[in-house]
Amino acid sequence: MSITESIVNINGTLLKGDEAKISVFDRGFLLGDSVYEVTRTYESIPFLLKEHLDRLWRSAEQISLPISYSPEQIKVEIDKCIKELAIPNIYLRIIITRGSGEIGLDPDLSPTNNLVIIAKEQLEYPKWWYEQGVSFVVANTLRNPKNSLDPNTVSYT
């Protein structure tokens, strides 16, 4: 599925993927001031949606990003994407940005969030991966220091 076949929901407005636009003054674009969560559907049902939204809220709390949508409102917008795309297995990326405003480091310069939901066909791994298996390598990278941002925070910052 190409970008033109994807659906993007921006603050409740459904758009084709190649028509979706967000302001270059959005802090998510300018500063990475956003959080995101990724899940998928199985037979049009979002997988562990409550848990993913809980983690989205925890990530937002880690960067002091108040979310102006309720989990129920986000679920409604996800359902709109699922209905519009009308396929059973969908990749869902849920993004909350701090929003657009004056350029500056003060987060209060952006009073309203932007909610972006990207919905596209979930690409499946090749069948042989499941039948034959695949090889992976585990890196010897050390963990982040304890005083750094929680590595479970899902953000672009």
Task: Tell me what each language-model feature is.
Residues 1-80, 102, 106-156:
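Helix-start/capping segments and mature chain N-termini
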Residues 87-95:
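Ordered, amphipathic secondary-structure segments that act as subunit-interaction surfaces
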